[in-house]
């Protein structure tokens, strides 16, 4: 009997240790910016099942779509996505033609507590979920990152009762994005300096 209990305890311990290795998306409550985090901004007023924004540094196009709502965005003030009927029930974020490594979301003021479910679709087609969670009081920041060299294809937020808006979306690690001009300038300066050192060594 004792031997059987020991084997059971070992099996449970192994399960706990192994499970995280298959969880390619990591969910952390709160607003936890990652390296090279970019804000998503809207440059025009839009209405539809799909609306588009742009990152504030690389100017990469991003997409917000819904299977249930008519989405509404404005180009003025804080970046946020609302719904025509006043409550967002379903919204998916993606970066057309790219994957990404991190996404920060804030489904603001859901109608009901613990009514937010997040589904992350990875680049290999697998999915990871988080929730239900959320408070009716206001902010519901969630930071999504990745492990195991995985990348994110899209992030979906579902809420049966709906939430007021999705605000302050941020993204980082977009695949194939060229560094911003200031980064390129620093890189160019470094290459130029390295070439100068080589030239001096050769002249000796």
Give, region by region, the residue ranges found by the protein language model.
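Bacterial N-terminal signal peptides that target proteins for export
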Residues: 1-10
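Sec/Tat signal peptide C-region and signal peptidase I cleavage site
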Residues: 18-24
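A short, hydrophobic C-terminal helix/tail in secreted or cell-surface proteins
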Residues: 179-198
């Amino acid at each position: 009997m004792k031997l059987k209990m020991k084997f059971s305890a070992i099996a449970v311990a192994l399960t706990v240790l192994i499970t995280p290795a298959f969880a390619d998306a990591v969910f952390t409550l709160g607003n936890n910016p990652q390296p090279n985090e970019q804000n998503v901004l809207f440059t025009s007023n839009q209405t539809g099942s799909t609306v588009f924004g742009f990152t504030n540094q690389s100017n990469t196009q991003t997409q917000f779509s819904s299977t249930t709502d008519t989405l509404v965005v404005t180009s003025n003030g804080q970046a946020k996505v609302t719904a025509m009927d006043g409550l967002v029930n379903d919204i998916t974020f993606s970066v057309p033609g790219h994957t990404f490594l991190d996404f920060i979301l804030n489904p603001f003021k859901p109608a009901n507590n613990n009514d937010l479910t997040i589904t992350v679709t990875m680049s290999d087609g697998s999915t990871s979920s988080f929730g239900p969670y959320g408070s009716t009081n206001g902010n519901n920041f969630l930071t999504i990152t990745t492990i195991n060299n995985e990348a994110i294809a899209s992030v979906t937020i579902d809420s049966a009762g709906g939430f007021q808006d999705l605000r302050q979306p941020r993204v980082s690690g977009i695949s194939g994005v060229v560094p911003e001009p200031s980064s390129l300038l620093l890189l160019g300066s470094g290459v130029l300096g390295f070439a100068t050192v080589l030239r001096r060594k050769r002249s000796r």
